Amino acid sequence: MAAMLMQPWPPFLPHLTLVFLTLILFFPNQSFSQSDSPRNIETFFPNDTITPPVQSPVLSPPQNPSSSSSDSDRGNILRAVLITAASTLLVAAVFFFLVHKCRRRRNRVGGVDNTLQPPVPPLAEAALAREGFTRFGGNVKGLILDENGLDVLYWRKLQQSQRDNKGGSFRKEIIHGDDEEKNVIYSKSKKKSGPVTETPLLRGRSSTSHSVIHNDNYRNATTTHPPHVKTDSFEFVKPDPTPPPPPPPPIPVKQSATPPPPPPPKLKNNGPSPPPPPPLKKTAALSSSASKKPPPAPRGSSSGESSNGQVKLKPLHWDKVNPDSDHSMVWDKIDRGSFSFDGDLMEALFGYVAVGKKSPDDGGDKKPSSASPAQIFILDPRKSQNTAIVLKSLGMTRDELVESLMEGHDFHPDTLERLSRIAPTKEEQSAILQFDGDTKMLADAESFLFHLLKAVPCAFTRLNALLFRANYYPEISNHNKNLQTLDLACTELRSRGLFVKLLEAILKSGNRMNAGTARGDAQAFNLTALLKLSDVKSVDGKTTLLNFVVEEVVRSEGKRCVLNRRTNRSFSRSSSSSISEVISKEEQEKEYLRLGLPVVGGLSSEFTNVKKAAAVDYDTVAATCLALTSRAKDARRVLAQSEGDNKEGVRFVKKMNEFLDSVEEEVKLAKEEEKKVLELVKRTTEYYQAGAVKGKNPLHLFVIVRDFLAMVDKVCVEIARNLQRRSSMGSTQQRNAVKFPVLPPNFMSDRSRSDSGGSDSDM
C-alpha cells in the first residue's frame, strides 16, 4: 500500500476522493431519519378511553427495545457505509494505479525500441535533421529551424511538462557561431557521461533510419560507463572535429545479473547496415543502453599473427649467405624470375593456429564461475601429461591394477614396460604421498599415482618384479637356443668337406703367386684373406682370383663325378685325329662344369647353423645368465619388503618365491651349458686360425665363413651363366686361357680328393 501511494497520481484523483467523502457524510443522515419515522407514526393515534391502561403497562416496555434496536441499526449501517467507501476507494486507487503503470510502460517500451534500431547513414541523417522534427509516441519533442541564417533549436523537457501539465511549451536557443556551438556541445558532454542518443525523425514503429550516435570520447575509453542514461530526452549535436579531453572515470556501478550481449562489430566496407537484433526485454534493453563494452583488441595482437597483420608461419632454419658483388651468382637471377607461390595455401599448411583466440561477440557470454578449476601438479607438467597419456593407453582401471599387484597376476609384458617407464622417483613418490589436500583437485597422473601408492606403497618395485617374471621365459629360451646354434655351427666347421678343399686351393694358389717373396711358402693364412680374393684381378681384367679358384674346384668335383661313374665299366682309348681330340676335350670341360656346379653351389646349404651363429651377439650370450641372476636377487629384496606391508600381499609373495626358486635352478644349468659351448667355440676358432681369439670377438669366425660362402654362391651363378651362353652360341673355338701363372701338375693331389669326404679325427 505504501509503494502504491508513492506513485504519482492522476490529476483527477483528488476530485474523485472528495466525491466519496461527501457520500459518506450524506448516507448516515438519511439512515437516521428513516429509523425514527416508524416510532413517530405509532404515537399519533391516542384514545381517551384506553390511554391510562396503555401508557402504564403496554407502551412503556416497548420503548426500550425500539431505542436499542435503532442504535444497533444505526451502527451497522454506519459500519457498512464506511467499509463500502473504503473498499471502493481502494479498488479505485488500484485500478487507476494499474492504468497509470500501463501507460508508463507503453511509453518506456516505445523509447527503448527507438534506441535499438540500426544506425542512420550520414547523408540521410543530415537530410532528416534539416527537414523535419522529432516525435516520441506522437508528441513533439524538439524542432530545428533556420531563422535568417541562424540554426535555432527548440526543445522541451518532458518531465517538466508532465509536472506542470504544459504540453506546448518550448524553449528557444540560438546558436550564433561554431565556437558557441562547440561550447554548448562540450557543456552537454560534461553533464552526460554516456553515449548521446539521437531520436529517430519518424515514428519508432515505421522508421527505417534509427541510429545511436556515440560520443568520440568514449570510443577509445576502456572504463565502465554510468549506470543510467535518460532515453526520454534527446540532443542533436554536430560532430566536433577536435574531440574534448576525456572526462574523469565514472563511479563503478553494480552490473545487472544477466548482462546483454555486446553490439555487433562494425564492418569496414560501406555496404548496407546489418538488420537490427531482435527486441530484448526491458531490463536487458536498459542495461545495454546504459553500459557499453570497450572495443576489442586489434587483430595483430593475437598469438597467431605478427605485428603487421600477417599470419605467423613455422620458421625454416638456414644460414643466410650474402651475395658476392665481384662475380655473378645463381641467386642474382632468382628475384627476377616468374615463379610465385600460393600464399594462402602456405599459410594453411605452415601457419600457426592462434590458441585461445575469441571473437568479440562471445567474449562476455561466459561467466567466470563456468571455468574449470585449476589442477594441482606435483610432477613436472610435461611428465605429468606423458604419464596421463600412458595411463589412458593401458586399457585397465586403477582397481584392476591394484588387484593384480596384490594377487600377483600375470601382466602383458608391454603393459609392464609402459608402467615401468612412468615410474616416479623416490622423491616424487614421497611428495605425492605427503599431499594432504583435496585429491579431486589433483591432475590425472598425480591422482592415479596417489591412490596407487596409498593402496600399495611398493607398487613400482612389485611391477619390476612382475616385469622380470614376464621377460624371464623368453630370455632364457632365447639364450638356450643361441647356445644350441653355436654348438651345431662348430660341428659343421669341424667336418672335412668341400670347404676345406676350397681352403687348400686358395693356399696353394696363394703360395704360387707369392713365390720368391716373404709371403710365400705359407702353411696357413688368416681367414680374413678369404674376403679379399675378389679384389685380385687378372691381367686382362676379365676375371678374379676367386673366380679362378672356384672354377677349378668345380672342374675338379666334376672330374671326380665322372671317375666314379666309370669305375664299374671298362674304358678303352681309341686313336683319333687331333681335331676330334680337341672337340672331345671341349665337351669334357663342359661336362665337368655341369657336374661340379651343383656340388659347389650347394656348399652354403651345408653351413646353415654357421650362418645363424654369425648373427648371434657374443656379449649378449655371455651376459644373459649374469643379468638373470642379478634381477632374481633384486626380486628377492622386493619380496622381503612386501612381506611386512599387509596381509593382502601374502599371495604375491608366495607366487614370486615359487618362481624365483625355479629361476635359480634353470639359470644354474644354463651357466654350465654356456661354459661348455663357449669353450667349444674357442677350440674351433683356434683350429682354423691359431691365436686369433685374443682381443677379438670369438664368434668372428662364423661371420667370415658366412660372407665367404655368399661370395662363392655368386661366382657359381656367374659360371653357370657363362656356360649357358657358350652352349647357346655353339662355338667350337678354343676357350682363351686364363693368364694366371702356370700351376704345377699336382696342384690338386689325389690325397686331397680322397680326403674330401672324410672328417678331421685329430681335432
Swiss-Prot record:
- Signal peptide as annotated in the record: 1-33
Q: Name one GO molecular function term.
A: actin filament binding
Q: Does the keyword Metal-binding apply?
A: no
GO terms (BP aspect): actin cytoskeleton organization; actin nucleation
Q: Where is the composition biased (Polar residues)?
A: 205-225, 726-736
Membrane-spanning residues where?
80-100
Instruction: Name the InterPro entries for this protein.
Output: FH2_Formin, FH2_Formin_sf, Formin-like_plant
Q: Which GO terms describe its cellular component?
A: cytoskeleton; plasma membrane
Instruction: Provide the alphabetized UniProt keywords.
Output: Cell membrane, Membrane, Signal, Transmembrane, Transmembrane helix
Q: Give start-end positions of Basic and acidic residues composition bias.
A: 229-238, 316-327
Give positions of region: Disordered.
Answer: 52-73, 185-327, 726-763
User: What is the membrane topology here?
Assistant: Single-pass membrane protein
Q: Which residues form the FH2 domain?
A: 303-738
Output compositional bias ranges, type Low complexity. Answer: 281-292
Localized where? Cell membrane
Matching entries from SUPFAM superfamilies are given as: Formin homology 2 domain (FH2 domain)
Q: Which family does it belong to?
A: Belongs to the formin-like family. Class-I subfamily.
Report quaternary structure and partners: Interacts with profilin.
Q: What is this protein called?
A: Formin-like protein 4
Which species? Arabidopsis thaliana (Mouse-ear cress)
Q: Which gene encodes it?
A: FH4
